[in-house]
Amino acid sequence: MATMPASEYEEPFVTVEEYLRTSYRPDCDYVDGEIRERNVGKYEHARVQALLAAWFNQHEKAWEAQVVTEQRVQVSPTRVRIPDVTLLSLGSQPDVILDPPLLVIEILSPDDTYSDTQERTQDYRAMGVETVWIVDPKTRTGRMCSGAEWVEASRLEVKGTPLYVDLPGIFSQMTSA
C-alpha cells in the first residue's frame, strides 16, 4: 500500500513576514506558521461587536482610549491575533499593534471552542495585556480576566481606569430596532 509523503498532509508553513504582507478576507490569525480562520459572520456576534465599539467610541476623549475592531495584534514573534474589539491609548498606531492594548475583548461565536478561546486569551496575557474580556451573546454573559482569575460579571471593568461596560445595557439593544 503506497503512502503519501508526510509533507503532503501538512499545512504549508507561512512566515510571519509573508502573513503580514497578505490580506485575508476575512482576516485570519497567524499561529506558529499556520493560518487559522476565525469564526465570524454571525449576526449576534457582529451586533455585539458593533454595540461595544459604539459604546467605547462615544467615550474616547473622556477615557483617553480609542477602539478598533478586528485589528492585527502581534502577541509574540510567531503569533498574530485578531481580537474582536481592542482598546488602545489615544494617538497614532502602527498597522500591526506591537504594544499591549489597554483591553482586548473576544466575543464568542457558536463555533468557538473552549480550548481555542483559552489559547487566545493566554496569548494576550503573555503579551502583557492586563485585562481580557470574553462576551457570550448566546448566554448574554461576560467574564473578565485581570490577573490569574476569571470573574463573571454584568459590569466589566478595567481596574485602575475609567473603562467599563454594563452588559445588560449592551444586550438590551440586541432586539431594539
Where are these regions (language model features)?
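Gly/Pro/Ser/Thr-rich low-complexity, intrinsically disordered segments predominantly at protein N-termini
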Residues: M1-A177
